[in-house]
C-alpha cells in the first residue's frame, strides 16, 4: 500500500535517483561510522547509506513509516519527535552499539556522530538550534533544507539574509551549500527550492553561554531597521555592561565575531583592552 505524505509531518519524499546519488556522494559514508538519519521517510537515502555503513540509526515520527523501517535488520529505529531526542545520550548509545558490532576498529577514535537528514521544513530551524546542545559530539551534519534557510545560515553581514540564524550557527559551524535540489525531485513537490547544506563544527569555537548569546542576538535583530541603541543598547544597560560597543549601527551591520566578543564580555563582566564604545 502506497504511503500518502502527511502534511502535518511536513512530508515531501525524495524520489530523484541522481539527486539521491549526489547527496550520498556529498556525505561520503564509510563502513562502521556512527550515523543518525533524521526523517528517513520512504528510505530513499536510507538504503544507499546503510549499504555503505553497514548499520544506521534513524529517527522517524510517523508510526507507519517506523514500522516499515523496522523490517530492515541493519536499521535501529527511534520512533520519536526529533526535538525530544537527547543527542548527547544518543551519540553514546550509537557509539557503544557500533563497538559491540566490531565497527569501532574501522573508524578513527573517538568516533563522533554524523547526522544527516531531509528535515521537515516546518520545524527545520528548531531542529538546528536543538542540535547546538550536542555539537561537541558531532563530526558533521548534512541536511536537506529550504534553499532560503541555507542562504540565511551562510549569509554575510550587511545583507538581507543575515540574521539571528546566521550568527548562532556560524558561531559553531563552518557551513556550505553543496547541492541544489529542485522541487520536482520530491513527491509531492514542495513550493520552494531546496538544497543540501554541509555543517562542520569548529574545532575551537568561542566558549559562550548559548542562552546568553541567543538572547543577545534575538534582541539585536528584534527590530532590524532600527539602530541598535533602541534595542541592544537598552539590553546592555540592563546587564550592567561597562564596556564599549557602537550601537549607532543596525544589527545586520555587526559581524559574527563582534557579537561573540560582546557576548564574552557580558558573560565575564569584563571589557576588552581595545574598547568597543557604547555610543
Swiss-Prot record:
Compartmental location: Cytoplasm
SMART domains recorded: rADc
Superkingdom in the source lineage: Bacteria
Pfam families, alphabetized: RrnaAD
Membrane keyword on record: no
Main location group: cytoplasm
Keywords of the record: Cytoplasm, Methyltransferase, RNA-binding, rRNA processing, S-adenosyl-L-methionine, Transferase
Class of enzymatic activity (EC top level): transferase
InterPro entries listed in its UniProt record: KsgA/Erm, rRNA_Ade_diMease-like_C, rRNA_Ade_Mease_Trfase_CS, rRNA_Ade_methylase_Trfase_N, rRNA_adenine_dimethylase, SAM-dependent_MTases_sf
Record's catalysed reaction(s): adenosine(1518)/adenosine(1519) in 16S rRNA + 4 S-adenosyl-L-methionine = N(6)-dimethyladenosine(1518)/N(6)-dimethyladenosine(1519) in 16S rRNA + 4 S-adenosyl-L-homocysteine + 4 H(+)
Record-listed E.C. numbers: 2.1.1.182
UniProt-annotated binding residues for S-adenosyl-L-methionine: 12, 14, 39, 60, 81, 118
GO molecular function: 16S rRNA (adenine(1518)-N(6)/adenine(1519)-N(6))-dimethyltransferase activity; RNA binding
Gene Ontology, cellular component aspect: cytosol
PANTHER family, per the entry: DIMETHYLADENOSINE TRANSFERASE, DIMETHYLADENOSINE TRANSFERASE-RELATED
Purpose of the protein: Specifically dimethylates two adjacent adenosines (A1518 and A1519) in the loop of a conserved hairpin near the 3'-end of 16S rRNA in the 30S particle. May play a critical role in biogenesis of 30S subunits.
Family: Belongs to the class I-like SAM-binding methyltransferase superfamily. rRNA adenine N(6)-methyltransferase family. RsmA subfamily.
Name of the protein described by the UniProt record: Ribosomal RNA small subunit methyltransferase A
Source taxonomy: Bacteria, Pseudomonadati, Pseudomonadota, Betaproteobacteria, Burkholderiales
Amino acid at each position: 500500500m502506497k504511503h500518502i505524505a502527511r502534511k502535518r509531518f511536513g512530508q515531501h519524499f525524495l524520489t530523484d535517483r541522481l539527486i539521491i546519488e549526489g547527496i550520498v556522494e556529498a556525505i561520503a559514508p564509510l563502513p562502521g561510522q556512527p550515523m543518525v538519519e533524521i526523517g528517513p521517510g520512504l528510505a530513499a537515502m536510507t538504503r544507499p547509506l546503510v549499504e555503505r555503513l553497514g548499520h544506521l540509526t534513524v529517527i522517524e515520527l510517523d508510526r507507519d513509516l517506523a514500522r516499515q523501517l523496522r523490517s530492515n535488520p541493519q536499521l535501529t529505529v527511534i520512533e520519536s519527535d526529533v526535538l525530544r531526542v537527547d543527542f548527547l545520550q544518543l551519540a553514546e548509545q550509537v557509539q557503544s552499539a557500533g563497538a559491540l558490532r566490531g565497527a569501532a576498529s574501522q573508524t578513527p577514535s573517538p568516533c563522533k556522530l554524523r547526522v544527516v537528514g531531509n528535515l521537515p521544513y516546518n520545524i527545520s530551524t528548531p531542529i538546528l538550534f536543538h542540535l547546538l546542545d550536542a555539537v561537541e559530539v558531532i563530526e558533521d551534519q548534512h541536511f536537506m533544507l529550504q534553499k532560503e534557510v541555507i542562504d540565511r545560515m551562510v549569509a554575510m553581514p550587511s545583507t538581507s539574509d543575515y540574521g539571528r540564524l546566521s550568527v548562532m550557527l556560524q558561531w559553531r559551524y563552518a557551513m556550505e551549500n553543496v547541492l541544489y535540489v529542485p522541487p520536482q525531485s520530491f513527491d509531492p513537490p514542495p513550493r520552494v527550492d531546496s538544497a543540501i547544506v554541509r555543517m562542520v563544527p569548529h574545532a575551537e569555537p568561542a566558549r559562550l553561554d548559548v542562552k546568553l548569546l541567543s538572547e543577545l542576538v534575538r534582541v539585536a535583530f528584534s527590530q532590524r531597521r532600527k539602530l541598535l541603541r533602541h534595542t541592544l543598547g537598552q539590553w546592555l544597560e540592563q546587564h550592567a555592561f561597562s564596556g564599549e560597543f557602537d550601537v549607532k549601527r543596525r544589527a545586520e551591520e555587526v559581524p559574527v565575531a563582534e557579537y561573540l566578543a560582546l557576548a564574552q564580555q557580558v558573560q565575564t563582566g569584563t571589557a576588552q583592552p581595545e574598547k568597543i564604545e557604547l555610543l
